[in-house]
Each structure stands twice: as structure tokens, then as C-alpha cells.
A protein has these predicted regions:
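Conserved phosphate-interacting/catalytic interface
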Residues: 47
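Polytopic alpha-helical membrane-helix bundles and their juxtamembrane interface segments
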Residues: 1-41, 50-158
């Protein structure tokens, strides 16, 4: 597939890394096996997509089996993250979480993350084409900035 470069794969790794670090930080404060499994599945799904793009960029081979786990792993990972939060609802200091989220500058980064993820959802539904390099660049830039905003929001929240 034309235009799938090593650079695209490396940019695709940014949101996977940012999200992974974010999940490690949250997991250190919310020790839940379900949360950890969900985070691991989500990150592994992203790693599969990065690996697919790396192979495309380096060897010019389309190993679609590397890309296929992305959606099911991400969806099941996010579902487990949500279930873990619901199951651990009473164990979470929601007042503390809320105060951290609305603190400045964290709230700016969290707001940007939510907006960018909403835009990403719209973009993937309406414009994204998996086989188009330009479409992948756009999606990865949106996702890289969004996941970095999540990480910065968490870091500034303390």
C-alpha cells in the first residue's frame, strides 16, 4: 500500500505509548485486575496496528492479520476498563478525582482530549479509510495529540 512509511508507523506509536503510560499511572492508583487486563488489551491492540504499519513501511508487505486484532482488542479493552470502574465505584475517591480533573491546567488537557476523541470518532466514521495513507496520517495526528493531552492532564493532576 502506497504511502505507508516508517514515519507513519512511528507516529502511530505515539498515542499507544501515551495511552499506555496513562493507564500505568491510573492503575498505580486504582489497583484492579480488570483495569489492568483492559489496559493491556487496549495497548496490545494499538501495538498490533503499529506493527502492521511498520511491516508496510519497511517490507512493503500487507500482513492484514496484524491489523485485524485492533478493533476487537481495543473494544474489549475499553469495555473491561469501564467494567472495572463500575465494579470499583465505591473504592474510588470521586471527590478527589473530580478536584484533580478540574484543576488548572489539567482541565484544559482533559477538555482537549475529550474534544479530540470526539472528533476522532466522527473522523473515523465519516472520512477514515484504512487503506489510505493520508487518512491514516490525519487520524494518527488527532490521536497522538489527544492521547498526549490525556497523559498531560493526568500528570498535571498529580
Amino acid at each position: 500500500m502506497e504511502g505507508f512509511t516508517i514515519g507513519l508507523a512511528l507516529v502511530d506509536a505515539i498515542p499507544v505509548l501515551s495511552f499506555g503510560i496513562s493507564m500505568v499511572i491510573i492503575a498505580s492508583r486504582f489497583p484492579s485486575p480488570l483495569f489492568m487486563i483492559g489496559a493491556i488489551l487496549s495497548v496490545l491492540g494499538g501495538c498490533c496496528k503499529v506493527a502492521w504499519k511498520l511491516v508496510l513501511g519497511i517490507a512493503k508487505k500487507d500482513l492484514r492479520w496484524l491489523n485485524k486484532p485492533f478493533v476487537p482488542m481495543m473494544a474489549s479493552g475499553f469495555l473491561l476498563l469501564l467494567i472495572s470502574l463500575i465494579a470499583g465505584f465505591g473504592k474510588i475517591d470521586w471527590a478527589g478525582v473530580g478536584a484533580a480533573i478540574i484543576s488548572v491546567p489539567s482541565i484544559l488537557f482533559f477538555a482537549a482530549w475529550i474534544g479530540l476523541m470526539g472528533f476522532m470518532g466522527w473522523y473515523r466514521k465519516n472520512k477514515f479509510r484504512n487503506d489510505d495513507a493520508a487518512s491514516n496520517w490525519t487520524a494518527q495526528i488527532i490521536n497522538a495529540v489527544g492521547q498526549t493531552c490525556l497523559l498531560l492532564g493526568i500528570l498535571f493532576a498529580g
